[in-house]
Design a protein with these regions (language model features):
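C-terminal effector/catalytic modules and regulatory tails appended to multi-domain proteins
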Residues: 2-22, 37-41, 211-357
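Extended interaction regions within the primary functional domain
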Residues: 54-58, 142-148, 158, 225, ...
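Divalent metal-dependent catalytic cores for phosphoryl transfer on phosphate-bearing substrates
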Residues: 92-237
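Acidic/His-rich, divalent-metal-binding segments that scaffold phosphate/diphosphate chemistry
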Residues: 2-121
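Generic detection of long, well-ordered alpha-helical segments
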Residues: 68-72, 141, 187, 269, ...
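A broad, structural surface signal
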Residues: 76-83, 128, 149, 274, ...
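Short secondary-structure junctions and interdomain/linker hinges
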Residues: 51, 55, 59, 154, ...
Length: 357
């Protein structure tokens, strides 16, 4: 039986309107891009996202939900990051080209579909899956490469271990399809940060939380989703993350695997702190590509400790760039030839050489 899908989000409705009123701004002017998008979403929901839970459970873990509802959450979050739902005179979505809306939405649809095959390296399956689900759409090879790269860049590592997937996968930051320019790195950053900020209570697997034998690493991820309350402030350029934690959870110790096959102990508040640090790194990374368009200046997090439905303590923290900045590499480390002695030896005569002339 087909999965129920919705295409009613503001971002999806923006695509529908653009196809109807600005058909000339798409590679093909046949007005079918929204229909193609809808059919691809249905296909992905039925064949891939309907089985991600079972596929992920094969390793024994109980991950947070990766079904089509998570895809809709990422679409909703991306819309909020672009200014939908905010009282702004200059929302970022107005600066998107019509075809960019299509590429962004399609990349979001693809970003987690590979989990139906295997969690490790799932992002690398984007191109293969797009080929399979978009056979009847007429997308050309260049469209396939651009859109699948945007989807793939939402996570993972490059072969050299680098997490800078956006730069590595999109050598050309603004490729074009004919006369249509696509801000590929910008779109990839939107997908990546929207995915990071789409944790919410609907992703939590409460059966896994209550079931005996659920691995602690899965419990932590599900508790995190269950207790987080996110809010995107487009006008204030801030991300707000509140965590309402029951006092009974504070002393509990969880055992999580380490890379050497051993385990280490961690408490839930410390796990939240680690996740916040990762979220802040993602914000700073994605801001490189979102600057001047839809960047965010800070994450404002807050712990609310609850006992018998009564708030007994609040701990706020702001994550943002403060103080005088440092450089990870010097100019000479970035470019060894930016060196006085090297350039002198390469282009200038020594005193002895001048005397010999």
């Amino acid at each position: 039986m087909p999965e129920n899908i919705s295409v009613s989000s503001p971002l999806e409705q923006l695509l529908k309107k653009a196809v109807r009123t600005q058909g000339g701004k798409f590679p093909r002017r046949n007005g079918t891009y929204f229909d193609h998008y809808t059919s691809i979403k249905q296909r992905l929901a039925d064949k891939y996202y309907a089985v991600t839970g079972a596929a992920l459970a094969q390793t024994g873990d109980r991950y947070t939900k990766h079904d089509i509802s998570h895809v809709d959450d990422v679409i909703e979050t991306a819309g909020l990051m672009l200014g939908f739902g905010h009282d702004s005179h200059n929302p970022a979505y107005k600066n998107l080209e019509p075809y960019e809306v299509f590429a962004l939405l399609l990349a979001i649809l693809l970003h987690d579909a590979g989990n139906a095959i295997r969690r490790q390296g799932h992002e690398k399956k984007a191109a293969e899956i797009l080929r399979e689900v978009a056979t009847a759409t007429g997308l050309n090879d260049l469209e396939h490469r651009i859109i699948s790269s945007i989807a793939q860049a939402h996570g993972g590592e490059m072969p050299d271990g680098s997490k800078d997937t956006i730069t590595a996968l999109m050598k050309d930051p603004e490729p074009n399809i004919g006369k249509i320019k696509i801000h590929a790195r910008r779109l990839a950053a939107l997908v990546r940060l929207a995915d990071e900020l789409s944790e919410n209570y609907t992703r939590a697997d409460e059966v896994a939380i209550e079931a005996p034998g659920t691995p602690d690493v899965s419990l932590l991820a599900n508790y995190y989703c269950l207790l987080i309350n996110p809010r995107i402030d487009f006008v204030g350029k801030s991300v707000h993350l509140a965590f309402h934690v029951d006092v009974k959870l504070l002393p509990r110790v969880f055992k999580i695997p380490k890379g050497d096959g051993q385990t280490e102990d961690i408490m839930f508040i410390d796990y939240i702190a680690q996740r916040l640090e990762k979220c802040e790194r993602e914000r700073r990374y994605c801001n490189r590509f979102l600057a001047g368009f839809a960047s965010f200046d800070r994450i404002r997090a807050k712990l609310v400790i609850v006992d018998n439905n009564r708030e007994i303590d609040t701990v706020p923290v702001d994550l943002e760039e403060v103080g005088y900045p440092s450089l990870s590499k010097t100019v000479k480390e970035l470019e060894p030839n930016f060196d006085a002695c090297r350039l002198r030896n390469k282009h200038s005569l020594t005193a002895e050489q001048e005397q010999g002339q």
